[in-house]
Amino acid sequence: MSKYIGFDVDSKKTVACVVQKGKKDRYTTFETDIEQMQNFLKQQSKDTERLHLTFEVSGQSGYIHDSLLNSVHTITVGNPAKMTWIYRTAKKTDRIDARKQAVLLSIGEIPKVHMPKKHVRQWRATIQHRRKIVSSITQVKNRIRALLKSVGINKPAVTKNWWTKANHNWMLQLAARPTETIQSAWQLTLADMLNQLELFQLQLKQRTKYLDQYLQTQPAANLIMTIPGIGPRTTEAVLAYTDDIKRFSKNKRYCAYFGLTPRLDESGTTRRLGHISKQGPSVVRWLIVEAAWRVVKKSPSLKLFFERVMAGQKNRKKIAIIAVARKLLTIIRAMLTTGELFNEQLISKYCYQQ
């Protein structure tokens, strides 16, 4: 006999619904605490009963998954983005959501999310953290330039590039001469911004070093970096979010996972392909598209493909580069599956398989 349990988890409380054939649905509410979850599941388990648990993916779902793995027979982490049509009801409560999850689990209709191991989740989190540091550096630089322009300094003093070491020293000198009058308050602000910039740059250096060292432990990294134009940042993101290449049985599924396949709108005899779905990890999608721009300059076959898709129309450049990015993912999937190094023959050999 099986019990299907749905957890509706938020930061403070968890609502559990137990669905079992021939019995009335049962609800329980408790604090979002691993020990209380384990105690609840222990109460539900009997020698002849198998517990099947589901809850939605969230920031804490990985930790919950690992902690409860030994308390139930199976755990399914659901994708709420693919269940929006199910939740379209006039009434929405935590109890209703928990029951819907349990019922969907009982009929095998939960859109499942792949749950990687802890070290892979930490790898992904570090990649995302580094990306945010890079974004913070860009924001601080833009604020510094805007501040200097607001006081009439429209260009750097030493070289054309604002961010050379010489210009950085020049900005430090500007910030080092504040007076006590309000007219020079901008210099204090500049000093704070330069301190922020130095801190972010130090953090970027440290996180990059850590990621570089970890990437060296991945056997597939050197394989992917044989593709001209693909460096360590793209490689680590692809490997971290791919995790297990065997879970992608087709090229289309691999490209769709990273949100690079077009949306489909079909009705009757009308079939329309729209913009790319942009689902999945945005960090990989952005990096692989940036890599595609570099690859078309170094790979004759992909350059030819890019030009064929563009068809001599400059306004089709973005469409063409997205097509190249899909080809890159197809090549990467083939390389990770077969262990082959990159060569131009791979493009014609694997890129037209589904």
Regions from the language model: what does each represent?
Residues M1-Q20, Q101:
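Gly/Thr-rich phosphate-binding beta-strand-loop-beta motif of the actin/hexokinase/Hsp70
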Residues K12-Q36:
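Short glycine-rich, Thr/Ser-proximal phosphate-binding strand/loop in the N-terminal lobe
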Residues I34-H52:
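Short, basic/hydrophobic alpha-helical segments
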Residues T54-I64:
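Acidic, metal-coordinating catalytic cores used for nucleic-acid/nucleotide bond scission
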Residues V77-H114, R121, A125, W170, ...:
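Short alpha-helix plus adjacent loop in nuclease-associated cores
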Residues R131-A221:
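Glycine-rich, often acidic, oxyanion-interacting loops/wings at catalytic, nucleic-acid
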Residues L223-T226, P232, E236-A320, Q353:
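Phosphate-backbone recognition surface of nucleic-acid-processing proteins
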Residues G312-Q354:
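Basic, amphipathic alpha-helical segments enriched in Lys/Arg and hydrophobic/aromatic residues
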